[in-house]
Amino acid sequence: MVRVAINGFGRIGRLVLRIALSRPNVEVVAINDPFISVDYAAYMFKYDSTHGRFAGEVSHDENSLIIDGKKVLVFQERDPATLPWGEHNVDIAIDSTGVFKELDSAQKHIDAGAKKVVITAPSSTAPMFVVGVNEDKYNGETIVSNASCTTNCLAPLAKVVNNAFGIEEGLMSTIHSITATQKTVDGPSQKDWRGGRTASGNIIPSSTGAAKAVGKVLPELQGKLTGMAFRVPTVDVSVVDLTVKLAKEATYDEIKAVIKKASENELKGILGYTEDAVVSSDFLGDTNSSIFDAAAGIQLSPKFVKLVTWYDNEYGYSTRVVDLVELVAKN
């Protein structure tokens, strides 16, 4: 049994808790969020506009959530270094704040007594692991990153295609649902002017490091992929459009067959496959990192192809966070 604490009780933090509660080997002992009181944490956990009401019983006392009779301590500390992780024998701290995402800042959880840290965001300093892609390279590192939801979607598909046909170069667009950093109406956003525009009424071009990050988890693709994002007014579920130049000639049917085989074997549960006439809402709550849409892709020539793959950027990603926690706990 691995004892876990969650720092940051936002979209990912709350879903990670839901998923962890279904895993017999994971016990969440505490959550921390300086902006959320205990009663409000109970309310936010119980009701979710996107994923629906929590199926179990949720209540609270002065300093704990009580979920199906089990207590989870709630803290409201701004500085993770002051958290009592040692006192509560925390094995792994999950940092889902989006703030403490580098080695030096995530170290605060170690200073507080946690044995290891899993960061739920891409990191420029912590090693990144994508389950299904490079988790076999995990070698006991103390602080690790689960990369981004988009990297988790793109990397399994890129790995399969590259192994079978070789990728010479590629461009990715993610058509991405709105997230918490966006604005309900036009507002100040000094670092990203477009990002400050009304989320519900615009298609907003944005930058993403997700494609370049694939090169960190798959070194053979370093420098071969880059990409961008379009933020669109849907609440959840996003889709990656990957256009690649292949090293070997292939038919679209051959490409589909290779991806389907991987989805049924080594990447089962990570990479899904569908030939149905699906739309984004069909993937709400899907636990795969990536679901290849065989009917949506197109091919121009034997070496030039566009591949389309869906992901629940909240639920699929949060599922992988818990997978990575279990992996780190074993090693």
UniProtKB/Swiss-Prot annotation:
Known pathway: Carbohydrate degradation; glycolysis; pyruvate from D-glyceraldehyde 3-phosphate: step 1/5
A GO molecular-function descriptor: NAD binding
Binding-site positions, D-glyceraldehyde 3-phosphate: 148-150, 179, 208-209, 231
EC code: 1.2.1.12
InterPro entries found in the cross-reference section: GlycerAld/Erythrose_P_DH, GlycerAld_3-P_DH_AS, GlycerAld_3-P_DH_cat, GlycerAld_3-P_DH_NAD(P)-bd, Glyceraldehyde-3-P_DH_1, NAD(P)-bd_dom_sf
Record PROSITE patterns: GAPDH
Protein name: Glyceraldehyde-3-phosphate dehydrogenase 2
Gene name of this polypeptide: GAP2
